[in-house]
Amino acid sequence: MSNQHILLTSNLLPVGSNISTWWNFGSMLLTCLILQITTGFFLAIHYTANINLAFSSVIHITRDVPHGWIMQNLHAIGASMFFICIYIHIARGLYYGLYLNKEVWLSGTALLILLMATAFFGYVLPWGQMSFWAATVITNLLTAIPYLGSALTTWLWGGFSINDPTLTRFFALHFILPFTIISMSSIHIILLHNEGSNNPLGTNPDIDKIPFHPYHSYKDMLMITIMITFMLLILSFSPDLMNDPENYSKANPLITPQHIKPEWYFLFAYGILRSIPNKLGGTLALFMSIAILMTAPFTHTSYTRSMSFRPLTQTMFWILIATFITITWTATKPVEPPFISISQVTSIIYFSFFIINPLLGWVENKLSTLNN
């Protein structure tokens, strides 16, 4: 019997010996998901999905329910932590060429879309001022779809404006989608272990493998402990750090906030949407800002999998990270110069990464053959 079979029969999953800390974010995401479902369940017990009572029920949870403030703040901070981890997880995948495992990458992109939908529905539930107006603006984008747009929007709203039926169905969707995420995550993990995890070098991991437990399981536990400690620090000292002050006012359809914006983790997509003056064009760009990730496995041209030994592509990668942060920052600002120009330039750079990368792959291939 081979060593791998011995390890598997001993319930010890064989994993590459050189996988770094960047490989811990999958287990951190699973921890976030468990935390969100647990806190979400306790919040759902006390929440009322009614436009007249939703805002009051959230206040009731934080003030009157024993430990309700912990549940409510942990759920809000947990959502932010979920997105921090998933963005790092995606960046790691892009950097180390893990997208070449197509099934895992495409299932992961589908998971990201599901997660964004869940977070959006959840943001509407407190029925604060920013919740209401963000929901109005984002759902209104459906009207940009030719022919079907208006009918789709009315169907989603359950009426001719955002009202009680909208809140009820958003609550139902916010409750059911995490279970879809669990099943999709299971598929994602099964597909991953079909081939096994890759490593920072991009080489065949079968050459040198060690048991997952205790070597990598303790590393996972360390990162999970750091993440939970960080969340508890925010919860204890600055629970409103990630929240919008506007959302502490009850939703009022008659008063529009000076600057409508979603939660920080959607700001990069919202910034791309806002940078295009055309409604349909902006909606397409918003969708493509996520969907373009699906093109990565099909446009890889380099002989080398990882970016570790590709300085040109590395430069483009760090430009992408800087661009992502800049778009997020500009989306927090009002729609006026110079923020309009900055968001337009950064949006072009964001999409150009996925076009220039294959070209740089060819250039690097030529350079490597010349050196040989």
Curated annotation (Swiss-Prot):
Annotated binding of a ubiquinone, by residue? H193
> Topology versus the membrane, per the UniProt entry?
Multi-pass membrane protein
Return the InterPro entries for the record: Cyt_b/b6_C, Cyt_b/b6_C_sf, Cyt_b/b6_N, Cytb/b6-like_sf, Cytochrome_b, Cytochrome_b_C_euk/bac, Cytochrome_b_N_euk/bac, Di-haem_cyt_TM
What are the names of the required cofactors?
heme b
| Record key words, sorted | Electron transport, Heme, Iron, Membrane, Metal-binding, Mitochondrion, Mitochondrion inner membrane, Respiratory chain, Transmembrane, Transmembrane helix, Transport, Ubiquinone
One GO BP annotation is:
mitochondrial electron transport, ubiquinol to cytochrome c
Q: Where does heme b b566 bind?
A: H89, H188
Q: Does the keyword Electron transport apply?
A: yes
**Which residues does the annotation say bind heme b b562?**
H75, H174
Cofactor binding notes: Binds 2 heme b groups non-covalently.
The entry lists its GO molecular-function terms as:
metal ion binding; ubiquinol-cytochrome-c reductase activity
Where does the record say this protein resides?
A: Mitochondrion inner membrane
GO cellular component terms, alphabetically, are:
mitochondrial inner membrane; respiratory chain complex III
**Further details from the record:** Heme 1 (or BL or b562) is low-potential and absorbs at about 562 nm, and heme 2 (or BH or b566) is high-potential and absorbs at about 566 nm.
Q: Which family does it belong to?
A: Belongs to the cytochrome b family.
Record text on subunit structure and interactions = The cytochrome bc1 complex contains 3 respiratory subunits (MT-CYB, CYC1 and UQCRFS1), 2 core proteins (UQCRC1 and UQCRC2) and probably 6 low-molecular weight proteins.
- Its protein name is Cytochrome b
Organism per entry: Dendroaspis polylepis polylepis
The lineage is: Eukaryota, Metazoa, Chordata, Craniata, Vertebrata
